[in-house]
Amino acid sequence: MANEIVSEFVNSNSKVDIMLFFILACFIFVMILRLLIYITVTYAGVSNSPILINGAVNGNNLRVFEQDPSVKGSIPIKRSTNKDGISFTWSTWLNIDGPGTTQGYFTSDQHIFHKGNNGIDPITGVNIPHNAPGLYLSPNNELVVYMNTFDSIDGNKVVIGNIPRGKWFNVIIRVSEQYTLDVYINGKLVKRHILSGIPKQNYGNVYVGLNGGFSGSISSLRYYPRAISNIDILNLIRDGPNLKRLTVDNSNIFSKGEQYLSLQWFLSSHSPDYL
């Protein structure tokens, strides 16, 4: 009788040990799986949708992001995934001090950023010939977007007027389904343009603040090799700009007071404009 009790106790302990071992093994497996997912998302995600300016800099600070992966410090921009035609997205935050003006050059537009060659036209202030895309600030307080296509170098131009000053606001340039170029301001679609042809992407560098740049600041410049979703856009607006200074300057726009532009500015006076 005593032997049977001892045998049952040993068997019972063995079952408990097996159960505990199984639970521990499952826990370790889940932790390893989560670690692998984190590593994959972190490193693959950064290379696919890099943040070129992870902070805030003055708009007149020239920055060049090399696309040659053999160059130390380069941030290569991957081409569109092409699942539904050429699709990609650029997002950035801007704080504009004033409209485009001449700064010792015969320029009319101020350069914010573009992807392509280094060939600013001294008369117009616009890069020639490659803008894929290009974002500029006009003397009329307008944002101007250029997008090269295979059939037209400068025929696809989008203008967004009445841009506010002294407030941080988000700009998204999204190309989807090959021919549709959308411009969002603070998550609201303010301009839709049907491209005249297939977008002409290039292997050129990304330039910020060429030819004296613009009067203001830029933050959180980011690229996606796809057309981001509305949820992605809302998340970008929710996260806001990264206001960490990347350079030393005397600007006070990095203060925490009134740094974001209210969506009411667009909802009350601007409806989407479809071209």
Model-predicted segments: where are they?
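Extracellular glycan-associated modules
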Residues: 1-275
